[in-house]
């Protein structure tokens, strides 16, 4: 996830290719970061963990986020779960920023630029749970492979491996780079939470 994080500033997810950037969700942080973040991760003080509000009203604590120093582009992703303990996995999808973030135990372990539904076939927003997993799914409706599919709705909306190119869209699904889809599939389980924020 590309995070604009300054001392006392809000967490803001930003797709740096797009301008002007508009944060779909901002959280005020009262924690003070004594030095500029370095390394692969930005850690927050246990006394001042930021919280993300989800569409269903639930709040999730954020203990650390990936420190992504370079701009992310269509097709790019970051994954780093080194030294992150096992824990509950949940996924945050920000359609406005075209970013998907994976959290485990409150720590962001992955972030990817996504493609999503077009105006004629929009991606639904709200809070969902993973209903089904299929590493080698093939859609009969669209006559297309959907590798590492994580189904979110009964009518077929899912997160799956896809080419992620600027200007591309899906029929409502969330497309992520294939290697990222494989890693997400390896940690996500049936019943895990997925929050989709509107564009």
Feature locations, PLM:
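N-terminal pre-domains immediately preceding structured catalytic cores
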Residues: 1-149, 155, 162-174, 178-199
